[in-house]
From Swiss-Prot:
TPR repeats lie at residues 227-260. InterPro entries: Oxoglu/Fe-dep_dioxygenase_dom, P4HA-like, Pro_4_hyd_alph, Pro_4_hyd_alph_FE2OG_OXY, Pro_4_hyd_alph_N, TPR-like_helical_dom_sf. Heterotetramer of two alpha-3 chains and two beta chains (the beta chain is the multi-functional PDI). It comes from the Eukaryota. It catalyses: L-prolyl-[collagen] + 2-oxoglutarate + O2 = trans-4-hydroxy-L-prolyl-[collagen] + succinate + CO2. Belongs to the P4HA family. Its cofactor is Fe(2+); L-ascorbate. This is Prolyl 4-hydroxylase subunit alpha-3. 2-oxoglutarate binds at K520. One of its GO terms (biological process) is collagen fibril organization. The gene is P4ha3. It holds the Pfam family TPR_P4H.
Amino acid sequence: MGPGARLAALLVLLKLGVGDPAAAAGREDTFSALTSVARALAPERRLLGTLRRYLRGEEARLRDLTRFYDKVLSLHEDLKIPVVNPLLVFTLIKRLPSDWRNVVHSLEATENIRAPKDGYEKVEQDLPAFEDLEGAARALMRLQDAYMLNVKGLAQGVFQRVTGSSITDLYSPRQLFSLTADDCFQVGKVAYDTGDYYHAIPWLEEAVSLFRRSYGEWKTEDEASLEDALDYLAFACYQVGNVSCALSLSREFLVYSPDNKRMARNVLKYERLLAENGHLMAAETAIQRPNVPHLQTRDTYEGLCQTLGSQPTHYQIPSLYCSYETNSSPYLLLQPARKEVIHLRPLVALYHDFVSDEEAQKIRELAEPWLQRSVVASGEKQLQVEYRISKSAWLKDTVDPVLVTLDRRIAALTGLDIQPPYAEYLQVVNYGIGGHYEPHFDHATSPSSPLYKMKSGNRAATLMIYLSSVEAGGATAFIYGNFSVPVVKNAALFWWNLHRSGEGDDDTLHAGCPVLVGDKWVANKWIHEYGQEFRRPCDTNPED
């Protein structure tokens, strides 16, 4: 029975929208921004109120059924003598064709469940959809890969990186949130359905383990069972060549469901394969992790993410330094910017306390109503892609005085002209579950890029402001520079995307590491080439 038809839909947030995927057409996804997930809690609170009323009604109905049961049971226990009392005979004759029919065909249960069903239908469009469940599952796999997380630990609510015999705690939650067997099954099934057995098998193994512990217990909200998990895991093992594992799991399945003819045929098939090629199929097979989308720099990228900020400090390299920066601007004379040079090639600087808490909150509030799934330039088009999971909004400086003040501060700090069309509007980004942006350049690398539609050249510089803190993950990794910068709330990260010659600086290839725990907000200001001719003059030195 699907979750749309079960009371489970009222109990598990990400399963609330599971049903007909077509019903979600035109609805904004939830998993790609945490602010969208937070909004989904409001309709769930309304559903909890409806469920509470339903439970009270059911409790009253069950008390009445218990009363009827006790009454009839007491009559049976008292019948030590033949039924001769005419009153007793009458009640028996009435009870069998009438009372029992009323009990069995009572509409009270149907009427009780109608209220939560109606309440669910009213808020269904505001709930996460089937695609969100898939997106959330893929996010867990992304975190599993990027931070080398142990699946068993994740299921127990523990964030640990496991490398060989070494275990490193990446994050210690104040309150543990463990996953159920059905939760693990759903994650494994998402991977299984795309042929990704590298991720499917450990999640399905954990589901089988948890289902075994609770076998015989019935949970309304569960969609899957031990038999389902064994079925999927057995076939996944077979698909990767581990026939011995597939046979063992299939035999276990038949213990619980001995009449399943399909599984019985599978057992015979696996036994025959092992008899014919036992030396090839009995051993456990190493499964290669899929590299989709293809990413040549994946190992470097994930290594930098795992270090959670690997840049050297000015204590280690004397050429790196900290200073108070005025840039010869009267605007910064009384309140200089607190500059920390993070790296020299590419030149990357971090400006601490670039915005205040109040300014950061205001910018988030201005952007939130306008957030839409982030896109990337692909040729002449802009597309939603798996390698960028976030939502973004664009804010003009006329929206609020705080944005005017921010633009003045950016102009004073950089010495650049940031008035349109020489700079883009402020882009505000909120990252979702495991939100990330895989290695990319901010500047255009193709002459057909949509960036050139502004008629102001390529993106010469980037200023990225961290509008929030995170508890773990979310660092900015510079791949070829081989360093990463952790999230520092209210700080701004600045770098040049282009050499003075106008050529792109390949060393600026960077990525937003997946957010392990936390709600990551950033604001990007991209400043273009045109308008900066006398502020950053051209130079033929390719290294400048």
